[in-house]
Amino acid sequence: MDSSTLIKRLETAKSSFQNLELQLADPDVASDPKQLETIARERSRLEPLVNDYLKLQIIEKECLEAKGLVKESRDDKEMELLAREELQNLELSKNELIQKLTLALLPKDPRDERSVMLEIRAGAGGNEACLWAGDLARMYERYGQKLGWNVKPISSTEADMGGFREMIISVKGESVYSQLKFEAGVHRVQRVPSTESQGRVHTSTATVAVMPEADPVEVKIESTDLEISTARSGGAGGQNVNKVETAIDLFHKPSGIRVFCTQERSQMQNRERAMEILRAKLLELELAEANAKERSARLSQVGTGDRSEKIRTYNYKDNRTTDHRLGVNFPLEQVLSGQLEDVIGACIAEEQKRQMEELSNQSED
């Protein structure tokens, strides 16, 4: 982004911020709690950006003063040296602030602040794939716990030999989607299964879908499009297990999506949870369609977000995790223990780099 485009966008943000301040002082706005909350939230979002812009203006003024001092001190070498050192420090602070402001102005995904549902499905590899799906679930659980997120399995189908055929995990917290969206795709593992007597390395896969939670208003579901039946639950039902039909089997006819929910203790809770999962799945379908259209206009990006894209290989023999989108290796044990900060951070940095290149190309056009 060139400097003129940056300043123009910062001035627009500053004007918007000042306008919001005026609205907050309006008695009519103060008497409308909903409008007041919306305006206050937008003001809070813009405040750090505007404050940094004001800092930039101050530093630019100080840079001009320092340059003037350098010229005035040419006859005093010691003073000139001090002035040049001060100018160098100011220029460094200025460039760091410009970089920060540029990143802050990059397009934001409106869903980044949302909680998500992770759907992990065993792929190729039979029993070993089911075990691998369980390993991935534990990896995300550890990562979420480190960040203080609330991670809870809400639907699962266990495999006969251990692990899971599929599992849906609710991950609630601040800006969850902004990080976990880079985990969508096929995760491939290369290792020797515990049942392998010859010591041969097997390759198995599991698929991860990352679904931002959908608001009921955002995804409209007609009751006539649903087929709902109940079943006896084998979940956390205590004495009610196999006596009361608490499980919900929900089928959405237009999309063909089926959700079977057994984790909650009551039929009503399972129904609410099943509807929550269905809304997230339907929103994912909409996003996939929108992303496909957007990708056709892009030259590159950090992954497609598609659940069929192979994004990572976990090689046990070499103790290596390879992210194929980045072409970078990470320590296997570190990643599986839930230390995903470096991997996800690298994906975010690469995405920001791509966005900055797009903005630069747009400004040149």
Curated annotation (Swiss-Prot):
One of its GO terms (molecular function) is translation release factor activity, codon specific. Its main location: cytoplasm. It comes from the Bacteria. Pfam families: PCRF, RF-1. Methylated by PrmC. Methylation increases the termination efficiency of RF1. Keywords: Cytoplasm, Methylation, Protein biosynthesis. PROSITE patterns: RF_PROK_I. This is Peptide chain release factor 1.
